[in-house]
Amino acid sequence: MVQITEVNESKAGTANRTAAHTHIKGLGLDDTGAARQVEGGFVGQVEAREACGVIVDLIKAKKMSGRAILLAGGPSTGKTALALAISQELGPKVPFCPLVGSELYSVEVKKTETLMENFRRAIGLRIKETKEVYEGEVTELTPEDAENPLGGYGKTISHVIVGLKSAKGTKTLRLDPTIYDSIQKEKVSIGDVIYIEANTGAVKRVGRSDAYATEFDLEAEEYVPLPKGEVHKKKEIVQDVTLHDLDIANARPQGGQDVISMMGQLMKPKKTEITEKLRFEVNKVVAKYVDQGVAELIPGVLFIDEANMLDIEIFTYLNKALESDIAPIVVLASNRGMTTVRGTEDVISPHGIPADLIDRLLIVRTLPYNKDEIRLIIERRSAVENLALEDGALDILADMATHTSLRYALQLLSPAGILSSTAGRQKITIDDINEAKMLFIDAKRSTKILENSDRYM
């Protein structure tokens, strides 16, 4: 007998993954732009959040492009969280390009080139195009053939007759034979809802008409209603691209589909460096589209974390790039005080950034959290991770975060949760926290052990 067993659906695939900033939903401001004490995943940092709220308003009003902001504060004070909240407030339509200072260094490509690539990634272009389309349910699909002009017994398709039906009428179209190939590729049959672009002849199958929903088919079909209005209509199509997408499209022309072309592409794994001339040409085309009203430029946000890792050459290039006609809003974050600028030997500057660039920055300061705020953060974070804490355990974690770091206290939550469930408890207790603390030491204790030990090389 053949053994057949049912596979139970696993819930593991649908479980949400918890990242460091999963709980951040926005800046948590009210209608007047004032920050609430606890809102949007944030606790405290009222002045910094209000400052970021003003920046968001300026970005939306398109009055902020080509300027730079510095988020300055100690470790674990929410600098990255603020940058993420800015992107959440701006929404998915505004480009947000995050990177770390060390990402700009590469053996293959110049660091200034990598910076410019990310600059262009953070600038969006919204292209609005009005297209004439024929849309409806296919009622007739008849290819008409003619004698082969080259002679012989074969026949060629001279044109295709397609009948389309919409809510307001029907139309019969005579189409070019090249469109018949597109119809075959989309596997269009009578009863399907399609649209055909008048200018390009592109065919798109939308789905099966819901009039055929009672049919029994082995394949799962997507049933769509009969299109409203006339068969022939004008449709506005909005496309969002970045300037980097346009650069790449022009820098890497597609080769042929033959084996030699494909092998040639495989043999070139090196990154293509986009020239200034190409970018200038792309900018000219973009400017023409903007003047015609076809496209709209959307300056986004380029977030560079650990800005103190950038060197003097990148900072010099950044000064020039910020003054260009097309520039995004640059948000830098640094947790350093007075430190040497990388790439120099004796230039000591605030946050590791040269004085001439510091002068161009709007600086937003983040302050260390007090014990009550830390307690609230741990409580909220434990709720995100679906962990229940006893009040005593919460107090111990808050104390620990005050003396060590907030990150260390938050990182102990998951191990303490596992220890608690292993012991058969529903809530994390003080014992679980102490056991996790014994198993995983913090940076200060590790330093003390190394100072008092001679057993290390």
Curated annotation (Swiss-Prot):
The EC class name is hydrolase
Which InterPro entries does the UniProt record give?
A: AAA+_ATPase, P-loop_NTPase, RuvB-like, RuvB-like_C, RuvBL1/2_DNA/RNA_bd_dom, TIP49_P-loop
Reactions listed under catalytic activity? ATP + H2O = ADP + phosphate + H(+)
The UniProt record lists the EC number as 3.6.4.12
Q: How does it assemble?
A: May form heterododecamers with RVB2. Component of the SWR1 chromatin remodeling complex, the INO80 chromatin remodeling complex, and of the R2TP complex.
Function summary: DNA helicase which participates in several chromatin remodeling complexes, including the SWR1 and the INO80 complexes. The SWR1 complex mediates the ATP-dependent exchange of histone H2A for the H2A variant HZT1 leading to transcriptional regulation of selected genes by chromatin remodeling. The INO80 complex remodels chromatin by shifting nucleosomes and is involved in DNA repair. Also involved in pre-rRNA processing.
From the Swiss-Prot or TrEMBL record, give the protein name.
RuvB-like helicase 1
Which organism is this protein's natural source? Candida glabrata (strain ATCC 2001 / BCRC 20586 / JCM 3761 / NBRC 0622 / NRRL Y-65 / CBS 138)
Q: Tell me the classification of the organism that encodes this protein.
A: Eukaryota, Fungi, Dikarya, Ascomycota, Saccharomycotina
Gene name of the encoded protein: RVB1
